[in-house]
Structures are given as C-alpha cells and as structure tokens.
Amino acid sequence: MQGGAFRNIIIFLLLAVLAFVAGSLASDGAQVALLPVVLVLGSFFLLYLGRNCWWLIFMVPPVFALADLSVLNSFPISFVICGIVLVYWLLMYIMGYVKVTWNGFAPLDVLNFILLTYFLSTWIANPVTLQIFTSITDEGYADVGGKEYFWAIGCVVAYLALSLIPISLESLIKVLKWTFIVSCIMAVIMCAKGLVLGGGYSTELAETTRYSPFYGVGSVSFDYLFAKFPVMGIVLSPWKLVLVLGSCMAIAMTGFRENILEVVVYAYSLSFIHRQLIILLCGCVAVWGFLVYLSNEKMLDGLPYGAQRVLTAVPGVEIENKEITGGAEHSLEWRFEMWRWAMTPSEGYIKDYVWGDGFGQSMYQLRLTTISMNRGKMSMGDQRFFAETGVWHSGVITAIHRTGFVGLTIIVVWSLVCFFYIFRVSIALRHVKGREFIYLSIFPFVTLMVLFYISAGTFRKLFDDIFYTAALAKVVCSVVAKNGLMPRMFTHQIYVPLIHREAEDEESAASPARS
C-alpha cells in the first residue's frame, strides 16, 4: 500500500472517531469538554488537507455560525481558524512545500491600513488594561475592557491569512461553492433541530411571538436565488417565485425589521448587477400596493406575529393589533431617546466627540452600575444601563462614542470605497461561471454595513463580520485583476473620426503582413 493512501486512511479513521466523540459530547451538553476535542479534530483535518488547508477559512465559520455550541460560539472562530491556517502555511513555506504571495489591491489595502492604524492610535490615546491587572490609584479605578482591540488584532491576522496564501479564481469559486453547500446543510439541520425541540411547527407560537426556526433556510434560499438569477428569471418561474416568497415569509416571521431591510438591500444590490433594478423597483411598488390593499381590507390579521411586526415599518400599512404596533413604536422611541442622550454633551456620556473616548470603560463607573443593579435601581434592560456601558443600538452613535467624528468619517469613506469596488468586481464577473458563489461571499458586506449604520451596529460586528468580508472582497478584486477581468478605471483614448478609422482599417488590411 502506498504511503499516501495509508496516511489518508489513518487520518480518516481518526477523524471519524473524534467526530463521534464530539457528537456525543455535544448531545450531552458538555460544550466545555468539547473544545479540546474540536481542537484535536481540527488539527488532524489540517494535516489531512495539506496545501488545501486554506479551505478551512471559508468552510468552518458557517458551521459555528449556524450551530448552537454555547461556549464555542463566544470565540472569534473565523479569526482563530485564520490564525491556525496562517501559522501552518508559514511552517510549510519554511520547509519549502508551498509559496507565499501577496493578493494585493492598492486602494483597499491602503484604506484598510488607515482604518486599522486609526484604531491603534485610539488605543494609544485611550489605553486600557485587563481587569485582573488593575489596582486602585489616587485617581480612582483604571480603565478596563477594550475587547474591540483584540478583535482588531484578529482582523489583522485574518487579513494576512487571506492575503499571503496564493489563491486562483477557479479554486476560490470551487471552495466558495462547497462553503455554500455546507451552509445549506447546516441551515436544514438547525431548522430540523428547532422543529424537533419545539415539538414541530407551533401555530400558537407563530401567532403570539417571534418565530425563527425557518430563518436560516429562508435566508440561504433567498440569497442564492437573487445571486444566481435575474429578477425576470425569478418572476417568470413559478417555483422560483414561490421559493422567494416563502423565504421572505420565513425571514419576516422572526419579527426583526432589520432582517427584512437586509433582504431589500441585498435584492436591490444584485438587481443592479443583473441590470434589472427598474424591474425590481416596479415589482416592489406592486407588492407595496397589494399590502396596502390587504391592510385596508383588514386581511393582514391572519399573518404570523413576526410578519405583522415587520409590516409596521411599511408606509401605508396599518396593523390592527395594538400590542404589535405599540411595541414597535416603543422600540423606536426607546432608541431615539438614547441617541438624544448620546448627542447631548451635558449628559456626559460622550466626552470627546472629535477623537472619541476609546473602547475602554472606567472600573469606577462599572462598580457604580453594579451597585445600582444589586439595589434594584437599574436592570440590564434599562436605557441608562445601555448608555452607561456604551451600547447605543446604532453603529453611527457607537462610532462617534468610541472613535469620534474623525473615526466615523474614516469608516464612511472606507465603506463607500469598498462598496464601489465590490460592485465593480461583481460587474466584471457577470459572465463568469460560478459567479453567484462569489456574490454570496462579498455582498454581505453591503447589507451588514447598511445595518451597521441604521441598526444595532457594534464594533464587534464591524471587526468579526464586516472587516472579514471586506478582506475577502479585496482578495477577489486582486484575483480578478490578475486574470485581466477587472476593467481599467481611467483610460485615455484619442478621438478619431469614423471616416479616418475606416481609412486606417482599409490601409492596414491592404498592406502586406510583416514578417
């Protein structure tokens, strides 16, 4: 038996045994004991893949994103995987097994460097430490916290891992295709798990509360259909249209209005790429008119609770359930009140509006907050608690608080440039086979960034999801440019009248070919 085949059999058997042990621990709820097993399992799988170890960067995060693994979900899985793969790749490079390159794209590289450098300057201006290393000083307690700085370090590791490993366009599409398949499998598994644990589909729960077992399946289906097919292709196909409508209902049943906003932004973005934006706009107007008609006829009361809550954000649509409308209005007023506090200097929640207060928090203030909670004067759901801890439920306000207007300006410019190149590279890939899998991987940047600005945006989301997707988009731009598919941004062409061009063509055709 050849050595390579024997090695593959041994590693496969070890992976099977470890997978069985991991499944047993997960079913018993022993998530803490599951961590070392997962690490050993991942190490063997890393050795098995060899030069293809970079596949794990794309294929592992969807598993942890959809699976409910308690303790493991609190870890920055994507950054950990990137760090492990980067170290392993560099070791193979030192031993001469692989090569190292730089998947560079100057505009995005420069802006990413500026963004991360500004976060570093924020830490220098507002240093923080870990709580276990703090001590009482004459001026009070030290500033602690700043998890966002560790997330920024993770971003650098992920950025280097994606940039240093040679990746071709064909291999990238292949890996992203398998990543999508893994996401579909995990979505179906989690949907089945939610239904089994809940005793099947519960009409009572769907009519009285937010219902989310179908969200993963609906989201994956909707994203793929709009990435693969143009709007007219969906409308003219009955099964595609039914699948899109069913996906929208599954997403709406969660009751989160930002989920529907994410769907709308994603659909409009892909329709722009497919050059059918006007068709989608007309379709949305028709759907809006139909919803207004149903509202006037009092025919929306039979919809699930979550769907009715989502429709409270649609102009012209009236929901009869006062509990739903009252809760939605209270949610908006609750946020607006906190944002008013944040932008009022006399409230004292933000000290430096220009450069920001950094990501730390005074231990003295944390101590006061803890005492207030213990005495029953404050709870974790109070506005004052969120304001004291810097949780503003708005990416814009959070950016101003932590990095100031200067940091917010840098983030806005960075996001706009990323928007531009994501759309540009997507248009360049419009006729490439398998392009939909690239769309599925880079267009979440557009939707997540929009939600960061107008919804509960946090810097953890910015680092963990948004910056990671921006790094992947940069790699896609680099790979596409190396393949000569990226059109030049500025070209200088001298205008030549048509009559002269025809004369030149005739002369060149009549002249003998040069040897």
Stretches found by the model and what they are:
Residues 21-33, 50, 70-81, 212-215, ...:
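Helix-loop-helix junctions and helix-breaking kinks within/between transmembrane helices
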Residues 7, 40-45, 153-165, 170-199, ...:
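Alpha-helical transmembrane segments of multi-pass inner-membrane proteins
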Residues 36-48, 84-98, 220-233, 406-429:
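Hydrophobic, aromatic-rich transmembrane alpha-helices
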Residues 49-51, 93-111, 229-242, 275-278, ...:
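Membrane-interface helix-loop-helix junctions at transmembrane boundaries of multi-pass membrane enzymes
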Residues 197, 201, 329-333, 337-403, ...:
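Long extracytoplasmic/lumenal interhelical loops at the membrane interface
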Residues 390-394, 401-402, 414-455:
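Loop-to-helix entry and N-terminal half of a specific, functionally important transmembrane alpha helix
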Residues 45-149, 153, 233-236, 445-451:
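N-terminal hydrophobic segments of proteins, predominantly signal-anchor/transmembrane helices
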Residues 249, 253-254, 274-326, 347-348:
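A membrane-periplasm/extracellular boundary helix in multi-pass inner-membrane enzymes
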